[in-house]
Amino acid sequence: MSSKKMVNSVEGCADDALAGLVASNPDLQLLQGHRVALRSDLDTLKGRVALLSGGGSGHEPAHAGFIGKGMLTGVIAGSVFASPPVGSILAAIRAVAQAGTVGTLLIVKNYTGDRLNFGLAMEQAKAEGISVEMVIVEDDSAFTVLKKAGRRGLCGTVLIHKVAGALAEEGMGLEEITKRVSVIAKTMGTLGVSLSSCSVPGATHTFELAADEIELGLGIHGEAGVRRIKIAPVDQIVTLMLDHMTNTSNIFHVPVRSGSSVVLIVNNLGGLSFLELGIIADAAIRLLEGRGVKVARALVGTFMSALEMPGVSLTLMLVDEPVLKLIDAETTAKAWPHMAKVSVTGRKRIRAAPTEPPEAPEATAAGGVTSKQMALVLDRICTTLIGLEEHLNALDRAAGDGDCGSTHSRAAKAIQGWLKEGPSLTSPAQVLSRLSVLLLERMGGSSGALYGLFLTAAAQPLKAKTDLPTWSAAMDAGLESMQKYGKAAPGDRTMLDSLWAAAQEFQAWKSPGASLLPVLTKAVKSAEAAAEATKNMEAGAGRASYISSAQLDQPDPGAVAAAAIFRAILEVLQTQGA
């Protein structure tokens, strides 16, 4: 069975894709009757050398994405993974010649069909008196022994577009550009790796891999590589790739050694996420620098793809200052990244963290709660939440991803670790503020953010006083902040239901003569009743709000956890006779 693709038709997909690129880019025009894209300002290039490239479609943004001032003049596109026809290549050569250019350089990847078709078109154009030269790019470092067909042309071709484009923009002649580019093209190598193959529209995947395998040294047309290896951490995979590319026993190695300066391309072959691409880029830069290699520039993104192939290729080009100047030259090509003209290696990448503001003197524990009791309370809360881990996870599976208990347990263990450090617990405001930071950093998820908001706001009133009315005010402040940013309200089947119920009881602390334990006892009972009542509520916030109410027949785990926290506080204070 063929794979699914977003196309109008298999036959017309290459035409439609190029038409879409031109329609959305005012700097491009289609050549009538051909699958050719040209610069729309072609007539301004009189007296300059034109640069044409191309090949099969399916490698986007290559090659048409690199048309622009300072790069390509035009591109001839074939069908998916198929060389463009001779007639279209010749038409493109004629078009740029008739616009007044003084010669055309064809930049061609080393594939048999491309060499034949571009070569034939070049010979026909020369027979018509047009000045044309061709550079064949061979940057594949996968094969370790010489093959008759030579090396494949891969993502390094994009760097040749850039270098040649900069030289043409300087006004250099065709013969000199050809010589310079031919030399530079021999200083680079590319190696790819993929998690699976790709599929041409209307066809199945080109090869199959086991679930734990990846393909090393594959090409950009879905063809298999030189070796299959087991999936491993990115650092190991990138190390293997760099070792293979720079191994002197490999006839096609890149002569990179300590002290070398390189341009690095981390190229998405089509199906990798940006997250994965960033991880690979970090590994490649770090590992190259660890070998004493200076990474002068790093290009990270999609430059030459293989449809939806979930893989990456690494390209290394040895550079000196003159070549780097060509890489840095301005271009209007849409697919070329905007890069600072600053070396990657040697640049300061980490900014010092901001300093904590000096802490103002704050009120110490009052209201009958000592620092010793506070430590006992926190410890009991932690053991309670750890003990509830599986129960809370079970409740969460009906409406979430089943990790509510694990999230609370993780927070509890983080607090236990902090308590072992022997922190000062004399200032409730400082304790709540520190807990807020701890939960934001270690608890994670929405719960960590909500508790962080609650504790940060609750700490503010306690900076001045810590009597019972202020503890009630702290509860109010925490709930207000939680509602403001969490957008939940009482009755929405969240942890807020338990917290709100307790807060209503805490209002009694604002009355003269109120006692700690009687009010806290009532608050705990109200919180537990509110948590139990959530099983009859329709969720109005959180992930559970996307679940049918018919499926929600258990209490909300967040509300249960909040009620359990109040119960733990009460039990400790009762034991301590607060």
Curated annotation (Swiss-Prot):
| Subunit comment | Homodimer. Interacts with IFIH1 (via the CARD domains), the interaction is inhibited by viral infection.
Domain note:
DhaK and DhaL domains have differential roles, individually DhaK is inactive and DhaL displays cyclase but not kinase activity.
**Cofactor(s) of this protein:** Mg(2+); Mn(2+); Co(2+)
Query: Member of which family?
Result: Belongs to the dihydroxyacetone kinase (DAK) family.
Q: Give the UniProt keywords, A-Z.
A: ATP-binding, Cobalt, FAD, Flavoprotein, Kinase, Lyase, Magnesium, Manganese, Metal-binding, Multifunctional enzyme, Nucleotide-binding, Phosphoprotein, Transferase
Question: What's in the GO CC field?
Answer: cytosol
Every DhaK domain range: 9-336
Which amino acid positions bind dihydroxyacetone, per UniProt? 56-59, 109, 114
Q: Which residues bind ATP?
A: 401-404, 446-447, 486, 494-495, 556-558
Residue numbers of Phosphoserine PTMs: 511, 545
Q: What is this protein called?
A: Triokinase/FMN cyclase
Q: What Pfam families does the database record attribute to this sequence?
A: Dak1, Dak2
* GO MF annotation list: ATP binding; FAD-AMP lyase (cyclizing) activity; glycerone kinase activity; metal ion binding; triokinase activity
Co-factor binding details: Manganese or cobalt are requested for FAD-AMP lyase activity.
Q: Which GO biological process annotations does it have?
A: carbohydrate phosphorylation; fructose catabolic process to hydroxyacetone phosphate and glyceraldehyde-3-phosphate; glycerol metabolic process; glycolytic process through fructose-1-phosphate; negative regulation of MDA-5 signaling pathway
The record places the active site at 221
Activity regulation comment: Each activity is inhibited by the substrate(s) of the other.
Q: Where is the DhaL domain?
A: 372-571
Domain of life (superkingdom): Eukaryota
By which gene is this protein encoded?
Tkfc
Swiss-Prot/TrEMBL catalytic activity: dihydroxyacetone + ATP = dihydroxyacetone phosphate + ADP + H(+); D-glyceraldehyde + ATP = D-glyceraldehyde 3-phosphate + ADP + H(+); FAD = riboflavin cyclic-4',5'-phosphate + AMP + H(+)
| Organism name | Mus musculus (Mouse)
E.C. number: 2.7.1.28, 2.7.1.29, 4.6.1.15
Q: What exactly does this protein do?
A: Catalyzes both the phosphorylation of dihydroxyacetone and of glyceraldehyde, and the splitting of ribonucleoside diphosphate-X compounds among which FAD is the best substrate. Represses IFIH1-mediated cellular antiviral response.
